[in-house]
């Protein structure tokens, strides 16, 4: 949505600028890692970091490997477990944020009756204490799952909800022995320990308020090497009762008090997987959805081009721009579908295909906003020059679309726990809102112009017909923005986690309906009032009257190329 052809709007051609933006976007993709997440933070001072959110089905698994954690703590601070992870099951579409909580409250100290798992890192005793809250039977064990060969093939989603495979994965004897080893005596060798070598007794007093009724907490080993700490664990969703949307967060409560933050380094790998692949529950149907919608947009574009070829006398440049928009939208959805296919099968996208998706998405967004604004202003249909106000609108919308697409690519390629992830997400929302409001101004100005001209220029019938058409188009644009920005978000919040893909279905269906209605309203037909060019000005009318009265034009005819073909005077 960032780059556009401004030819016809000004005298410059931004080809060099466009390729510069594309080069910048390609370089931005270097950190893209798909659903196998790798996050490295250096000198971080945030107290709470939202690492990731994922929807799990039965037999889904979560693997977390903290390979490096370097803290700048004093000896007194090492005695308290104020650093760790939290895993919670969140409501679908909800946004978890710790920015507004009390600065003196630590999420690792709270008790909860809801589904919650805390991993408390005890630096002094070199152990990780696991506390569970709520009714749950999550299977948590140290280490990572053994790597299995990646299964190729398209994902096979079950849009109705949970997969039909309801059998439960039971822990293997090896995993059970690993859990028992956690309760044996520690084995320490010098200053270097590893999670497999350092074990502590799990005989602890239970939490003061534990709704789950567990008598003791599970303990995992914590490795220590060169002033850094490491450990790993994996979780298996073993029953349908444990399915849902899970949110994983990292907390450093030593930095909760403003002005007393201490920098720390963090390197973590997160691997999330469902039985069908690496996609979240809400993303599994998107592969087929984007493929079907791509075919629908392509079919609509082919039909539109055939209409243009049959009405060559009534076709303007804006009609071909609309055809280019539909084709670009189709190609963008195709690359998006292929991108999800490889993410599901391999855990990460193919970088070249991801770049093509971002480029086509960029062009599609630019063509969309430019086409809506040009139709609303009447360019190419009624006039070939834009007013100063309309030029200012394009001067605002086009740079904002560049910024919006940069924000979109940063969000797609960065990890959720990156320090600037939230900032770019807010920029995308704000810029998109401004662009949606800006494209309405040309339509409103055209409506006012037609209202003023309907009773003054002698062409009341034509202007009233155009006014009615512009009002319909204004309502169409409002409905398009309303459905794709507001209703879609409300739907995403309301539906369960496995139905989150309905958000994308509503957005793409609304876009297709908007394209079809726009093409129907402004099709190159002779009786379309929008395509009827304005008649001669008053001076031409007076000259025509003089020539007619003098008999000079007797037997002559004048041919005008208008939207209704050839007109005989």
From Swiss-Prot:
Regions annotated as coiled coil: none
Lineage: superkingdom: Eukaryota
Keywords: Glycoprotein, Golgi apparatus, Host-virus interaction, Membrane, Signal, Transmembrane, Transmembrane helix
Biased composition (Polar residues): 180-192
Disordered: annotated segments: 144-219
TM segment ranges: 289-309, 318-338, 362-382, 393-413, 427-447, 475-495, 499-519
Any Gene Ontology CC annotation: trans-Golgi network
Membrane topology: Multi-pass membrane protein
Tissue: High expression in spleen, lung, stomach, large and small intestine, and thymus.
Tagged with keyword Transmembrane helix: yes
Glycosylation sites: 59, 111, 182, 226, 230
Any GO BP annotation: defense response to virus
Family as reported in the entry's similarity comment: Belongs to the LU7TM family.
Domain remarks: (Microbial infection) N- and C-terminal domains are essential for mediating AAV transduction.
Name of the protein in question: Protein GPR108
Organism: Mus musculus
The encoding gene: Gpr108
